[in-house]
């Protein structure tokens, strides 16, 4: 029996995902050792392998078949644009991708003015403004605190993930438009879905049943 390999986005998401896998009967004791230097963790008995990855790399591992399954945020899936199957919304880590800025920028958005948009997610921002709003904008990619951009005059608005909106309010910014809702998703390699259909479908269905039970 070949291993089913699962790539997990590092952080809270990986921890929550492993709790779900344990609840559906796929534990991995090796992962509970926080001092371990191992990169790959296995459940030999059931034939599963797990590894932790930077979130933006998870779709790449899945597309190229280095992982059969990935657990990663919808924001990363949209930004990376990889060829894979998105099979289930895990309903964890819910938040929104939004266009944010000072109130004064609202009119510029409404009038489709040429503006600068700063974001850690340039592909999502480009798709939203080009294909949904049909507004010509200049996209500026940032890696740090994008909230700074409108404050220091780098851009009129930002496209970023919003959870509570507290950081925005503290900096005199607000949500001006919602781009899309976000949450953690399960993704599957296209070839693996055909080759290991029975085992992967069982895993998907077991996860679905568990999450639906929790939601009641």
Swiss-Prot record:
Its EC number is 2.4.2.17. Keywords: Amino-acid biosynthesis, ATP-binding, Cytoplasm, Glycosyltransferase, Histidine biosynthesis, Nucleotide-binding, Transferase. It is found in: Cytoplasm. It is an enzyme of class 2 (transferase). InterPro entries: ATP_PRibTrfase_cat, ATP_PRibTrfase_CS, ATP_PRibTrfase_HisG, ATP_PRibTrfase_HisG_short. GO terms for cellular component: cytoplasm. One of its GO terms (biological process) is L-histidine biosynthetic process. Pathway: Amino-acid biosynthesis; L-histidine biosynthesis; L-histidine from 5-phospho-alpha-D-ribose 1-diphosphate: step 1/9. It catalyses: 1-(5-phospho-beta-D-ribosyl)-ATP + diphosphate = 5-phospho-alpha-D-ribose 1-diphosphate + ATP. One of its GO terms (molecular function) is ATP phosphoribosyltransferase activity. HAMAP family: HisG_Short. Catalyzes the condensation of ATP and 5-phosphoribose 1-diphosphate to form N'-(5'-phosphoribosyl)-ATP (PR-ATP). Has a crucial role in the pathway because the rate of histidine biosynthesis seems to be controlled primarily by regulation of HisG enzymatic activity. PANTHER family: ATP PHOSPHORIBOSYLTRANSFERASE, ATP PHOSPHORIBOSYLTRANSFERASE ATP-PRTASE. Heteromultimer composed of HisG and HisZ subunits. Lacks the C-terminal regulatory region which is replaced by HisZ. Belongs to the ATP phosphoribosyltransferase family. Short subfamily. This is ATP phosphoribosyltransferase. The lineage of its organism: Bacteria, Bacillati, Bacillota, Clostridia, Lachnospirales.
